[in-house]
Amino acid sequence: MNYSVMIQNRRSVHAFREKEVPSEAIGQLRSYYEKTCPRLVPEIATELIVLDKDAQPALESSAGYNQFLIGAPHYLLLMSAPHSYAAINAGYMMEDLVLKLTELDIDTCWMTFTDSDKIKKALSLTTPLEVAAIVAFGYGEKTAKKLRLNILSMSQIDVRASSSTTRPKRACMIWFTWGVGATSLGLTR
């Protein structure tokens, strides 16, 4: 996976079409998680659960922005064993899975939640692992092109036609923290 290209192409979608993601793509995602997905702390036990749209009613009362759940054909739940670095590890892993979905031309949206036990109860999950991250995924609705005023500085202003409401990405180097994450991916300065 070319991380630089995937980071530039990644966007968050808040309206999904009803179109299901093919089982082959979900299989590729599962295989990527099991064999390739980097972990910051490999000794933390994790599990990836892929849910379909039938899980939406259960998630509506326990996840989403102020209990407002983004409707999607599928949801990813990343479960993690309790650990002082569980949240960091899960965020790192899930963002890598989001980039893999981007590579497969599948749109995503991170979901907020505050109570792992409430989600586990709503979904009837009996695992000892805790919910660490949730992402909705599928194919985003087509959006009309909109004019966007792009102000880079006081002297660099342009107007662009944009087909999405995403914001330009800052250079990858600004956001990427050199250290454990870089070395686990085999990157050097």
Q: Can you annotate each of these PLM segments?
A:
Residues 1-189:
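Acidic, surface-exposed loops and disordered segments
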